Amino acid sequence: MENIEKLLMQEKILMLELDLVRAKISLARANGSSQQGELSLHRETPEKEVAVHSALVTFTPTQVKAIPEQTAPGKESTNPLMASILPKDMNPVQTGTRLAVPSDFLRPHQGIPIPQKSELSSTVVPLRAESGIQHPHINYYVVYNGPHAGIYDDWGCTKAATNGVPGVAHKKFATITEARAAADAYTTRQQTDRLNFIPKGEAQLKPKSFAEALTSPPKQKAHWLTLGTKKPSSDPAPKEISFAPEITMDDFLYLYDLVRKFDGEGDDTMFTTDNEKISLFNFRKNANPQMVREAYAAGLIKTIYPSNNLQEIKYLPKKVKDAVKRFRTNCIKNTEKDIFLKIRSTIPVWTIQGLLHKPRQVIEIGVSKKVIPTESKAMESRIQIEDLTELAVKTGEQFIQSLLRLNDKKKIFVNMVEHDTLVYSKNIKETDSEDQRAIETFQQRVISGNLLGFHCPAICHFIMKTVEKEGGAYKCHHCDKGKAIVQDASADEGTTDKSGPPPTRSIVEKEDVPNTSSKQVD
C-alpha cells in the first residue's frame, strides 16, 4: 500500500512537469505572434508553477524507514529485496529539465538578456583591426644621373635604367617624400634639371648597347593630342634588350675615346694600357660583363682577369667561354686559382654599306698571379674616321707578329680554334702533331693580304719583310698583278715606279671566307 502511494505521488509530479513543459512550448510558439496572447500566457503559467512548487514542498511520505542493519561493517547499501524509492532518493527531481522559477515567466527567454542590435549606418562600415594585415610596401628608387635619371617605383625599371651603364648612382628609399628630397638635393648641388617621377608603366626601354646608353640623350615624353588621337591604355613595360652582334663605327669611336681618356678614377674594375696611337682595356674582377662584351667586339682588350664564376666573360662568344671553362676543369689541378685571358686582336673595318671585317683574336689562357695594375693615364684622342684604316693596319701587323711567335713556343695546347679565333694555353708536354697542325692551318688562313677583310698592300709588304727575316718567301698575286699594271702604265707614260708599299686606301676587295674548321678539347 505504501508503494502505491509513492507511485501515485510520483505520477502527479510527472504530470505537473508535463504541464509545465507544455506551457513552455506554448510560450515559445506564442512568442512574437501577438502581445495579447503573450500576456495571457504569462498570467496562466504562474498558477501552474506555484502548484508544482507547492507539491514539491509539501510532499512528505507517510512512513520513513531507515537503512536496515548490515551484516558486515562498512556496507551502507540497501537491501536489494526492499524498495529503494525513499524520500532521500527523491531530493532532486529525476528529470533533465531545470524547474522553472515563477520569476522566469515574468522575463522573456527565461531571464537571459538579449543584446540590442546596433543600428548600422548606411554610409559608415565598421573596419576590422588591421594589426594582423600585411600591406605591400612600395619602395622608391632615385637614379641620380645617366640617360634615364629619375624617380622610379619599380625595381625592374630601375635595373633597366642602370644596368650596363657604369658611373650611374642610384639609391632606395622607403617613401616618395624621402626620394623626392634626396633627388632635389642632388639636382640643386649639380645645378641640373629637377628629376621627374617615372611610374612603372611609363618607363622607356633600355638602350641597345653600352655606348648608346652613355651617348644617347634621354627621350622626351610624348605629348598626346586631346583631339584626333586616342591615348593608349598603357605604355610597354621595360625589357632587357640584348646587345647587337655587330658593333657600329660610332660605338667603336666612343669606346676608343673612353679608353684613351680614362684616368683610373671612379672605377677599380679596370685599368688601361696606353700606347702612342691606341689604348687597351684591362678588366679585373667584378667588371661589367656587357662592357667586356662590347670592348671585345671592338678589339680593344688586352687582358681579362675573371672571377671564379667567370661572370665577367658570360657575354663573350659561347665557344670561347666554353674553352675557358674546360681549361679550369681539365688543365689545372686547383680550380679555385685565378686565371687570365691575354688577347691580341685586330680592330673592325667598315665600309659605306656597314661592317666589313670583324676582329680576329689570338687568346692565351693561363694561371694568374697577383695582379698589379698599371697606372692609367688620360691620353689625347684625336682620331678621325679617315685614321681608322691606318689604325687597323697597325693592329693587324701586331696581330701577325703575335701569331708568328707561336712557332717559337714548343709546349702549347690548343683549347679551341675557329675561322677567326685561336685559344691556347701552355702545356707541360711538347706540342703534339694535332695541335701543331691546327696552329699552322690557322696561320695559313689568316696571314694574308686580306687579313682586314680587303686586300691591303701594306699588310702584304709587312708579311713579306717578316717572312724574309725568317728565311722564307711570300708572294701575293694581287700585289704582283697591281705591280705589273703600274709598270705597264709607267712605260707608256715615261714615268718611274715609286718604291715602298702602296697607300692603305687602295681598292677594297671583299675577303674570301674559307671554310670554318674548329678544334675543341673534350
Swiss-Prot record:
Residues 488-522 are annotated as: Disordered. One of its GO terms (cellular component) is host cell cytoplasm. Keywords: Host cytoplasm, Translation regulation. Its main location: host cell. It is found in: Host cytoplasm. It comes from the Viruses. InterPro entries: Ribosomal_bL9/RNase_H1_N, RNase_H1_N, RNase_H1_N_sf. Gene3D superfamilies: Ribonuclease H1, N-terminal domain (3.40.970.10). GO terms for biological process: regulation of translation. The keyword Transmembrane does not apply. The inclusion bodies are the site of viral DNA synthesis, virion assembly and accumulation in the infected cell. Enhances the ribosomal termination-reinitiation event leading to the translation of major open reading frames on the polycistronic viral RNAs. Belongs to the caulimoviridae viroplasmin family. This is Transactivator/viroplasmin protein. It comes from Cauliflower mosaic virus (strain D/H).
